[in-house]
Amino acid sequence: MALRTLASKNALSFALGGAARPSAASARGVTTVALPDLSYDFGALEPVISGEIMRLHHQKHHATYVVNYNKALEQLDAVVVKGDASAVVQLQGAIKFNGGGHFNHSIFWENLKPISEGGEPPHGKLGWAIDEDFGSFEALVKRMNAEGAALQGSGWVWLALDKEPKKLSVETTANQDPLVTKGASLVPLLGIDVWEHAYYLQYKNVRPDYLNNIWKVMNWKYAGEVYENVLA
């Protein structure tokens, strides 16, 4: 039982930094996750992000990460019961990739708001921190756009809060690596998906256009709340 508990906790912590959202537990005690509902319609972000992209992104891509992550957790539980250490190690990649995909996208949906509501620059404590750490809001946007455009292959660009020095930073992660893989003290405030599935149907191969436009639907209220809660 100790081996099972330790392996499960290590896998979840490694993949998600403790941020998994449980939905249901199996008879063996495996905690799974569920696809989160969106607080807006698929077409609410148009013309910045098309309804077709949002539907495919949420219903197909994110849903697949959820299915595969839950499957990997169930497999992990089974091999831990058997005491198969090599199988536990082999499952870490699937847990990290699919768990990271679920965690990253769950943040991404919260970071977005309908075109009629989003895009206002952050105010309050987060706005002040951005001015202090980057010089201005415009400088932050320029930095994140540059980092996102330069990221080779697929991945994410993040506005992160480092809890230890209480400073903001811009970070990138490859593939579906969650931000916690860059440092245990980093908290994601805002993430932009730069996988092609997030923009290709609309923007083709011009990733910079997608990055320039997505700021029009950013939910800075959410990012500000996370920032203040972490520092409270």
UniProtKB/Swiss-Prot annotation:
Its main location: mitochondrion. It is found in: Mitochondrion matrix. It catalyses: 2 superoxide + 2 H(+) = H2O2 + O2. Its EC number is 1.15.1.1. Pfam families: Sod_Fe_C, Sod_Fe_N. Keywords: Manganese, Metal-binding, Mitochondrion, Oxidoreductase, Transit peptide. Gene3D superfamilies: Fe,Mn superoxide dismutase (SOD) domain, Iron/manganese superoxide dismutase, C-terminal domain. Its cofactor is Mn(2+). Mn(2+) binds at H57, H105, D193, H197. The keyword Manganese applies. It comes from the Eukaryota. Homotetramer. Belongs to the iron/manganese superoxide dismutase family. Destroys superoxide anion radicals which are normally produced within the cells and which are toxic to biological systems. This is Superoxide dismutase [Mn] 3.2, mitochondrial. The lineage of its organism: Eukaryota, Viridiplantae, Streptophyta, Embryophyta, Tracheophyta. The gene is SODA.1.
